[in-house]
């Protein structure tokens, strides 16, 4: 069961990272194509990145309060429709630039909590076995590093073939896939509650 959970977590983090890296290329290209303005493209990039600087530290407290698994689930579940809404609203003629900025800002706000949950969920899942922790950590780091390299390259291949809007739909699907993997195969952890009880009895 634990091996299945770790494998699902590694797969979820790889898929989610792949989607994030594809978005970093597909979203600016989408803005440039739809607005024809490099300035607006730069502004969208700034709005997407800004939450990383502002919410980095508070995200750690959020993970401690909600738990890493819950934070990861909420982050992926929120990012999927937020990202899919961008090309969908554009296709229906309802995407103003102000609304685009709002969606991108919200999308960016869920990035820091997800990254913070990545750092804490593995120890919760694996436990205190240093050998297993090292093996699992190597799998996660290697997989996400590979996804970080493949994501932009894959986006560069898919954008000319599918178009930037459809690539954004693909990116949204990766977040949904990550959500389903964690929801169905990564169990809730009770270690924090148990440790809190041990401290109280001591």
Predicted regions and their residues:
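Alpha-helical transmembrane-bundle signature of multi-pass membrane transport and export proteins
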Residues: 1-202
């Amino acid at each position: 069961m634990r091996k299945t959970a770790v494998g699902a977590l590694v797969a979820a983090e790889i898929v989610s990272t792949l989607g994030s890296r594809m978005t970093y290329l597909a979203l600016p290209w989408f803005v440039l194509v739809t607005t024809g303005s490099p300035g607006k493209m730069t502004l969208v990039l700034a709005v997407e990145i800004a939450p990383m600087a502002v919410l980095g530290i508070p995200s750690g407290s959020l993970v401690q309060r909600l738990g890493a698994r819950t934070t990861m689930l909420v982050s992926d579940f929120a990012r999927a429709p937020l990202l899919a809404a961008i090309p969908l609203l554009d296709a229906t003629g309802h995407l103003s630039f102000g609304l685009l900025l709002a969606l991108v800002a919200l999308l960016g706000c869920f990035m820091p909590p997800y990254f913070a949950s990545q750092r804490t969920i593995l120890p919760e899942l694996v436990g205190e076995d240093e050998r297993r922790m090292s093996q699992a950590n190597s799998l996660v780091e290697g997989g996400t590093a590979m996804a970080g390299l493949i994501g932009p390259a894959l986006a560069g291949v898919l954008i000319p073939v599918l178009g930037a809007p459809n690539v954004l739909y693909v990116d949204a699907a990766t977040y949904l896939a990550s959500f389903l993997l964690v929801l169905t195969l990564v169990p809730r952890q009770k270690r924090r509650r148990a440790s809190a009880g041990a401290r109280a009895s001591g």
